[in-house]
């Protein structure tokens, strides 16, 4: 029963265990977090939300943070941009509603180099500046 439990995957192992042993309820993690910080209220005077993840692929659409933020932003009519280290494009991602998905890591650099704090910071800043300038 627990093996097929929605939300009981790798990140939900503890939740699935508590569910099976103590009849605990399972809640979507990003929904719980967004509700706890009143994210809808924070969006009231917002024009753009920038979110991110290490890798954006079809798994992102299965309840991960960027997709939860996108859904909340869409409900309020707020544009949402995602930044990521690696982007694996798909039709589903192209149609899900992100204004733009920006891959920040140059593919020709080794992962160790890309992950260095100075390089990562520079890559993020550069991509965000280019995106903002493209909006003008």
Language-model-detected regions and their locations in the chain:
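N-terminal loops that bind phosphate or other acidic moieties
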Residues: 1-136
């Amino acid at each position: 029963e627990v093996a097929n439990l929605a939300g009981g995957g790798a990140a939900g192992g503890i939740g699935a265990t508590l569910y099976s042993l103590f009849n605990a309820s399972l809640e979507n993690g990003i929904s719980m977090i967004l509700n706890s910080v009143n994210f809808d209220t924070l969006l009231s005077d917002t024009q753009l939300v920038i979110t991110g993840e290490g890798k954006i692929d079809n798994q992102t659409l299965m309840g991960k943070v960027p997709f939860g933020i996108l859904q909340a932003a869409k409900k309020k009519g707020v544009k949402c941009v995602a930044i990521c280290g690696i982007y694996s494009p798909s039709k589903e991602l192209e149609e899900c509603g992100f204004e733009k998905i920006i891959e920040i890591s140059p593919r020709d650099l080794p992962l160790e180099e890309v992950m260095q704090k100075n390089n990562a910071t520079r890559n993020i800043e550069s991509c965000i500046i280019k995106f903002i300038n493209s909006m003008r």
